[in-house]
Amino acid sequence: MAGDFSNRAPWKRSACDRCRAQKLRCHRDSGHSTDACLRCLKSGIECVTSKARPTGRPPSRQVQPTVSVEQGDTSSSSHTTDSSPSAGGTDINSMMNFEYDLSLDNILDSIGMQHSDFIVNDNILVDISPLSSQSTSQHSVAQAQTVDPSTIQSTTSYQFNSLPSTSSMDSALPIRSDHVELLLSRLHSKLSAQLYSIRSSPWDVKGTLNLSLAHQGIGQDFENCESHPLVQVSQACTELEKLLSGLRAPASAEHTPSSFSYTPAVPPRLRTTQLLIALSCYIQIVSIYGIIFSKVFDYLLSTSKTSIGSYQSSPLTLYIGGLPIPPNETLSGNLLVHLIEHQLHQIEQLMGLPEHYRVSSRAKDTKDGELGLFGSQHSQSLLNAAIQLGEDRDGNHDDIRCVRALKVVMRQIKDF
């Protein structure tokens, strides 16, 4: 028999597993082929000699299990070798390993990527399989949880009632990643249509500087009045701010003075599509504000300072701390600039944009940009690549130039 080593001659016996693995000569005492070899005796381990294995290279991508041999496992190892298929038979393990080779992790490893590049966070990532089976039940629950916007009381935060309804009433709770990406795509489509409309269609520039007093709930006065580009882009800013806050991890977040922003200890890993859509929405908002402020500055230049306040329907008296503010012709323009700077600051803080990509200025002692969505090294590389790609295209809008142009025209309105 091939496995009976006692009947073999010393020069025909098989080497032990340890010597065969190290490709060394297996020395034993002459006439005692069944004893342990000298190398195993010197190392103080058990000398195990298995049956001869088939020659040749093993199949490609076959997972070789690691076998650890201990004292008292000789019977179990021999039983395993006896039940193994012969050299000419079919290997069942190789058939089982075929499904393992088709896993997503092996495919991503072969192309140099990781599965974490496509996920946002383990806390807010939702599996796709239960969504398909529970789509009808979730739809009915979402309808039951829908809140009438008219019942919402006015708050101190700057927001509008035209935001898309979500299943969660608390803005601090995270939105599911697939919902965030869908809502960002819808917002991007609305901003593209608004950018085209504000460039091609005429609109009331004088109404942009019109001061009014509102005693109603927040957002109700805008719903009744005629749609204005400034109101539309302000609603888009608030919606983008809420969506960006939904991408932050609430477990390790600390509440900041902003209504929506949270500061996590470690920035979450986002999908590339989410980062690019959010960046494109921000660039479109900056472009729309750049067109609005350019028209406003041209209007201020064409109108004398003495007649700037003549378009007000009724004289308004503003008070700070009970003291009236003296009337100023350029007060409305300065208030508008500061309001938009504060609004963009909230978005830029959530996105974590560097200083040269921001419209608003931040304090030097803060590090909000490092904790935003573009705070990681991977996101910073993606941001630089996207901005450089936008600069190299012919006939398209220059992203850096629109940020600089908006900063310049806002500074001109302040100094007017």
From Swiss-Prot:
Residues 50-92 are annotated as: Disordered. Keywords: Nucleus. It comes from the Eukaryota. Fusaric acid is phytotoxic to plants such as cotton and banana. It has been shown to induce programmed cell death in plants. In addition to a mild toxicity to animals, fusaric acid exhibits acanthamoebicidal, antioomycete, and antimycobacterial activities. Residues 16-47 bind DNA. The keyword Ion transport does not apply. Transcription factor that regulates the expression of the gene cluster that mediates the biosynthesis of fusaric acid, a mycotoxin with low to moderate toxicity to animals and humans, but with high phytotoxic properties. This is Fusaric acid cluster transcription factor FUB10. The gene is FUB10.
